[in-house]
Amino acid sequence: MDFKEELTKWREERSITLESQLPGLTSNLLEEVTELSRATELVDVIDAMLDYNVFLANAIEGIDIDPVLDPEIVKEIEEKHKKLSVMTNEDLALYKKSLISLLLEGIRASIAITMPNIKQEHIDSFTEYLNGIIINIKSSITLLNYDYAKCLEEVMKAIHTRKGYWDSTISKFVKDKTQPDRYEPDYTNCKL
């Protein structure tokens, strides 16, 4: 599945552009960090990280939502995975704090990108930084023994079933909370 193409299709079906989402990006990212901080289950942590990535890719040109991991990173993940056989509640709490710190750094970069009159060279630099965060998130999800691409497919299924409307006052697609047939991502089949 071409995730970038899927997001483009989603935006086109709703007459939403990258540019129209940029003003609300910081608020949307903060919402995902809040969800991450409140998550009590590992799948909720994964869901918040994936939604964070989707918001970035849906608002900023040049974001690679499914980057290829460097072989050295993959090797490092495999080594760490050997040590991380079972995650306790204490481990999850510590892990979440580390991720929250990382995602907040991404929010700082997204704020800079939304500044008026920012030079293209600075946008490129911040976009590269945000792509590094996405690599970190993909690595983290893989380390947690989940297939990142399959998880993203679940997110895409959910996105495509959503009904709602674009609210230009908050620069966000507002989901219809009463929609009975809304698909919720099921990450149980995404385990490695």
Model regions: which residues?
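Flexible "arm" and connector segments at domain edges
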Residues: 1-192
